Each structure stands twice: as structure tokens, then as C-alpha cells.
Regions:
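Thiamine diphosphate
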Residues: 1-164, 169, ...
């Protein structure tokens, strides 16, 4: 069997910016002294006149990005998720969101898969924070292909967009020739009638593995990739809930306020069914190898399978 291709979505982000930069001279990239880590360094090398290093000053970077957006250019502000959504929340809210400016935020190193950097850098609250900002699109790709498509879609979208990218290399799963990406539109990756698994980011691949394991036992799970947390594809979520009668959400984020929260809010009003939220259960992360942490917090295929079995 050939080895599955893996690539970190932060690398996909950097590569996508370079390709977009070749086509659009109004694209400007900002970073906060993290060009190597966020992979925006390759854009800096290709287009030095359109790259701004703001130093370790994320709040200022968001203000600068907002100012650039008022000139008609399309700024992509890049830093770790903890600093983009956490440290600079006020500036994102007031300088970007409130005036509805066309700023794109590329937040890398999200979730516990940041690994050894530990709890202070493992942002598991960013979806929740960004969802509360009116008009903000919030998205998280599952692989290289989706990440590149998401960056291009973010450029085309008029308005603020928050995208979370990962440090850990993840399998390419969206290599279907019929694959089409659109912000706000989920993708059914596997059909099933017994329950629905809704996942995003690096949790999509292990959710598919868990579904395959369940199928061996006669349980057919529909698997949906909801890459856009806001706006949520409510039509798809409601239809799946009505069809299967049970829903499980899986995310590398707190179970409070993220994908699970968005799905529960939707279903509570439009299709009440039992829901199990799998994610970071109201705790902080810790320092350790990314793969080991995903296993400890139940976000690997075995952990997801075990929690679904207990639920059904």
C-alpha cells in the first residue's frame, strides 16, 4: 500500500499565498515575527515589497491590516491562533469586525497539536471567540487541498475571515476529482444511516477511520466535513440529523462554543436529536508530542471510536 501523503496546513497556507500573490497584486501579507513558523516566509521571499513584518506586536498588526484594507488592498494577517484570537481579540473585534473591513486572518498552530509549546500556546478557544464577532467567517481546513482552496475563497470573499491552520502534518483526504470547496458549505465524505459524525480540521481523517471501524460492526456512520464553523451549513446539518437521529461532533477545540456548540445551537432550534460533543472537555492542554496529546485527549481514531461507542 502506498504511503498516504501528509502535509501541515500551515505549509499549505504559505504556498497558497504565493500562488495568489502571482495573480493578485493587491494581496499583502503581514506577520508578527513568525514568518518561518507561519510559513509566510516564502511569500516574503517572492514578494518582499508586499510583506510587512510587524514584530512581536499582534495587536498593532491587526490595526495595520485594518488600515491597509481601507485602501482597497487585501491584507492577510498571520500569526499563531493564540495571538490572533486571544491577544489581539479587541483589535480584531473593534478595528476589523466593527467596520466590516476586508481583512483575512491566517491563524496557525491552533489546538493541542501545537505539541511541546504547551498550554499557553495551544489555543482551543479561537472558534468560540471569533464566532461571536458579527460578520466574521470562521473556518478550519482538513488537509492541504482544502487549505489552499480556503485561502483562495477567503481572498474572493468580501469581509473579514478567520482561518485556523495546523502545525502537524495531516493526511490528504480531499483528492476526489469531484471535490469542490465553498465557504459555508459542508461536504459529505461518507454516507450512513445510523448516526452522523461532523468534524473539521485534523479531526476529519481520524473520524473517517472511526467510521470505518464502526462499519465493521454493522454501524453505518455518515461523515460530514464542516470546514466552515460560521456560517454553519445548517441545511446539511439539519438534514443529516433528521436522517440518522444521532449526531457526534469532533473538533480540536473546546467542546464549548466551537463546532459542537454551533451544531447544538442549530439542532436545538431546528431538529432536536441526541448530540455527543468530542473535543477538549473544558481543560487546558499540556506539553508533549502532538500525536501523544491527540491520543491522550481522545482525538485519535481509537479515541473517537471509543467515545462514539459509549454514546450509541
Amino acid at each position: 500500500m502506498s504511503e498516504v501523503k501528509k502535509i501541515a496546513t500551515r505549509a499549505s497556507y504559505g504556498n497558497a499565498l504565493v500562488e495568489l500573490g502571482k495573480k493578485h497584486d493587491d494581496l499583502v501579507v503581514l506577520d508578527a515575527d513568525l514568518a518561518a513558523a507561519t510559513q509566510t516566509g516564502i511569500f516574503k521571499k517572492a514578494f518582499p515589497e508586499r510583506h510587512i513584518d510587524c514584530g512581536i506586536a499582534e495587536c498593532n498588526m491587526m490595526g495595520i491590516a485594518a488600515g491597509i484594507a481601507t485602501t482597497g488592498k487585501v491584507p492577510f494577517a498571520s500569526t499563531f491562533a493564540m495571538f490572533a484570537a486571544g491577544r489581539a481579540f479587541e483589535q480584531v473585534r473593534n478595528s476589523v469586525g466593527y467596520p466590516k473591513l476586508n481583512v483575512k486572518i491566517g491563524a496557525t498552530h491552533g489546538g493541542i497539536s501545537v505539541g511541546e509549546d504547551g498550554a499557553t500556546h495551544q489555543c482551543c478557544e479561537d472558534f468560540a471567540l471569533m464566532r461571536t464577532i458579527p460578520g466574521m467567517v470562521v473556518a478550519c481546513p482538513s488537509d492541504d487541498i482544502e487549505a489552499k482552496a480556503m485561502v483562495e475563497a477567503a481572498y474572493e470573499h468580501v469581509g473579514p475571515v478567520y482561518m485556523r491552520f495546523g502545525r502537524l502534518a495531516v493526511p490528504v483526504i480531499n483528492d476526489n476529482p469531484d471535490y469542490k470547496f465553498a465557504l459555508g458549505k459542508g461536504i459529505v465524505l461518507r454516507e450512513g444511516k445510523d448516526l452522523t459524525i461532523i468534524a473539521n480540521g485534523l479531526c476529519v481523517a481520524p473520524s473517517l477511520e472511526a467510521a470505518a471501524k464502526l462499519a465493521e460492526e454493522g454501524v453505518e456512520a455518515k461523515v460530514i466535513n464542516i470546514h466552515t464553523i460560521k456560517p454553519l451549513d445548517e441545511e446539511l446539518v439539519v438534514a443529516a440529523a433528521k436522517e440518522t437521529g444521532k449526531v457526534v461532533t469532533v473538533e480540536e477545540h473546546s467542546i464549548i462554543g466551537g463546532l459542537g456548540g454551533a451544531v447544538c445551537e442549530c439542532l436545538a432550534e431546528k431538529a432536536p436529536v441526541p448530540v455527543k460533543r468530542i473535543g477538549i472537555n473544558d481543560v487546558y492542554g499540556e506539553s508533549g508530542p502532538a500525536v501523544a496529546l491527540l491520543e491522550k485527549y481522545g482525538l485519535d481514531a481509537a479515541g473517537i471510536y471509543k467515545q462514539i461507542k459509549a454514546f450509541i
